[in-house]
Design a protein with these regions (language model features):
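Extracellular and secretory-pathway beta-repeat/beta-biased strand scaffolds
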Residues: 1-220
C-alpha cells in the first residue's frame, strides 16, 4: 500500500446455485496488530472473460451491476459479514477496513466499451448509492485493443440530470473507484497492469484508445 494503505485483491468465491455470483472473498482473516496501517481496502473481484472480441454494452453492464448488488447484499449485509470475518482476530481493524466489489473484464481479443457507464448512482435524496456503500473497482484487460467509445465515471452526475437533485456527497480522497484500463494486456500475469512485450519493442501488442469522432467521451 501507500501512505499506510493496505490493498488486498482476491477473487470472489462461493457461487450461488442460481447464478455464478460469488458472495465471499478468497482471503483469510486479517492478522492482529497491523502496525502502521491507516486503511485497509479489500477488493473481491469477479472476472468476466471472453475468447472473442467483446462489446461492453448496457446488457453486460446491467448483469455486472446485478452481480455486484448480490455480492454486497441488500443493505450491505453480505459485505458486512465478510468484514466481520476478516477482522475477527482484531476488532479494532473494523473501522479501518472496507470491502469493495471488483469487476475485471478480460478478452483475448479486442474490447470496446460502447455504452456510458457510471459505476455509482444516486438515490432520490441525491446520495451516492453503491454496493455495500463502497466504490466499485473496475479493471478492463484486452489482449489486443481496448477502445473506450463511451463515457466512464464513478458517481459524477450527467450534466443533463435534474437541477433539483443536488448530491450532498463531496469527493473525498480514498473513497473513489480504482479504474485500470489496459490494452495489449498480458492475461497470464498476476499484475493486472502487465502488458505484452512486443517482438521488436516498437509495435505494441494492443492499444488503449479513449474517444470517438464527434462525441464527447469522458473518463473520470
Amino acid at each position: 500500500g501507500s501512505a499506510g494503505v493496505l490493498r488486498v485483491r482476491a477473487p470472489r468465491v462461493g457461487a450461488t446455485a442460481a447464478a455464478d455470483v460469488g458472495t465471499e472473498i478468497a482471503v483469510d482473516a486479517l492478522a492482529a496488530n497491523l502496525d502502521g496501517v491507516r486503511r485497509i481496502e479489500v477488493e473481491g473481484f469477479k472476472v468476466y472473460g471472453s475468447t472473442a472480441n467483446t462489446t461492453v454494452n448496457s446488457t453486460l453492464i446491467g448483469r455486472i451491476e446485478s452481480d455486484n448488488a448480490a455480492f454486497a447484499g441488500i443493505g450491505g449485509e453480505r459485505s458486512d459479514a465478510i468484514l466481520a470475518r476478516l477482522t475477527a482476530n482484531d476488532a479494532s481493524l473494523a473501522d479501518r477496513t472496507s470491502v469493495r466489489a471488483g469487476v475485471e473484464l478480460r478478452s483475448t481479443g479486442n474490447i470496446t466499451m460502447s455504452s456510458a457507464w457510471n459505476l455509482s448512482t444516486f438515490d432520490d435524496n441525491g446520495s451516492l448509492a453503491r454496493p455495500g456503500g463502497q466504490p466499485v473497482n473496475l479493471t478492463v484487460r484486452a489482449q489486443r485493443d481496448l477502445t473506450v467509445s463511451a463515457s466512464l465515471s464513478d458517481g459524477l452526475r450527467n450534466s443533463n440530470g435534474p437541477a433539483s437533485a443536488i448530491a450532498p456527497e463531496a469527493a473525498i480522497v480514498g473513497t473513489g473507484a480504482d479504474l485500470r484500463l489496459v490494452g495489449g494486456a498480458d492475461l497470464s500475469a498476476a499484475d493486472p497492469l502487465a502488458v505484452i512485450a512486443s517482438a521488436d519493442d516498437i509495435a505494441p501488442a494492443g492499444n488503449l484508445t479513449i474517444g470517438r469522432s464527434n462525441t464527447d467521451v469522458i473518463v473520470r
